[in-house]
Amino acid sequence: MAPPSSSTQELTNLATTDWQYDGEEQQGHQSLPPADRGKAAYLFLAACFMLEALVWGFPFAFGVFNTHYAKLEPFASEGGIANIGTIQSGLMYFAAPFVSLALQRWPHYRRHAAGSGLVLMVAGLVAASFCNSVPALIATQGVMYALGGLVLYFPAMQLIGEWFVQRRGLAFGLVWAGTGVSGIVVPFLLQWLLDTYGFRTTLRVWSVILGIGAAPCVWWVRPRLPIGSANSFRPIEMGFMKKMQFWIFELGNVFQSLGFFLPTLYIPAFALSLGFPDFTGPLALALFNLAFCFGAVLIGTLVDRFHVTVAISVSTIGQMIAVFIFWGLSTSQIMLYFFALLFGCFGGGFSATWSGCVNALQRQEPSGHIDSGLIVSLMAAGKGIGAVISGPLSEWLLSIDTWQGHAGYAYGSGYGVLVVFTGVSATLGGTAWIGRLLSLL
């Protein structure tokens, strides 16, 4: 969902797009708590912020687990460790449309779903602490955590539009900041726990933190309006999927996602391979998540002021510079930190272009009526596809790397093929910009 992180802006938009309320109906409920202000609204906002931090902070810090598992038997000899993180993140994107539509169809069960999701997340982490194989970790730390996180997270995202009307943008911005804050703190905390107590205790400690931190949030995440006054499930027009313009946007989105998750998976291991101190990887991840937040704002501002392909091209060029220059030529910690900042900003901000894709498609629709929530959900699913594929693909790329010792800088570190693939993936993410030049958009 993080966004935040951008990691999560796309999921928030998905859950809240096209929510409208009848003003006369709201006036008829004088006993309702006020929107945009008041104790109840602020407690709701604080609960959403906490859920954002808890649900998305853990997946975005998986790189520290990836490094730890790679040095620990029996996981190290099995392979497929990266699949834990990519399947976890991929499901949280790919399953988002289905979870969102289900909760919209049965709104009375939102709070029950949130509680069930929290139980599933905690159970997944506790079960993972007893695992002795990679497939078991994929099923628990990967699948169970992801599905539970979605069901816990989406009821809150769907209700922000009820509590904040005039100040809705500010509310979403504050919620998204939760991922950035957790991205700065969580990698260091997890690294310390892993180094001191091992993965089993670390997973159990995080399950306790998650349970204690999220349980009050489930209580405070409640609707402001009576359930009957919210939009109900309705048929959705999908004619835009027959048009080439949508698939140009989606294709670039999938291409970009194929390489986007790889740096967060391999930065800690890459830093260790160059002999950097143990704190280098977690610090780079923290900088990545911090820049993620600023990137979403930057790219989102460009989307509001220019055609979406301008924002896509800026994001693409920024990623190319980050990967091919600052990662590919990195021989020092400073270079790696600059890479994390640039890639977090421009790569993380790429998802902010989704709303611009909606605007571009609406301008080309004669009636102008396109369900923006569906488009955003499909873009999120596309990103999830890329996330899932990138896991096994990255391990294959590392296995065929023959540049080690034969190329300079990071290209000869054993991660050279991975660096190039990430850069090429980012470049192909600019497909829509080429489509604009060819007058296809």
Can you name each region flagged by the protein language model?
Residues Y69, G142, G149-F164, A171-F172, ...:
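Intracellular juxtamembrane helix-capping segments at the cytosolic ends
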Residues M1-G57, H112, W220-G239:
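Cytosolic juxtamembrane N-terminal segment immediately preceding the first transmembrane helix
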Residues A47-F49, A53, M121-L125, V134-V151, ...:
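Hydrophobic core of transmembrane alpha-helices in multi-pass small-molecule transporters
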Residues R167-L225:
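Helix-loop-helix hairpin linking two adjacent transmembrane segments in secondary transporters
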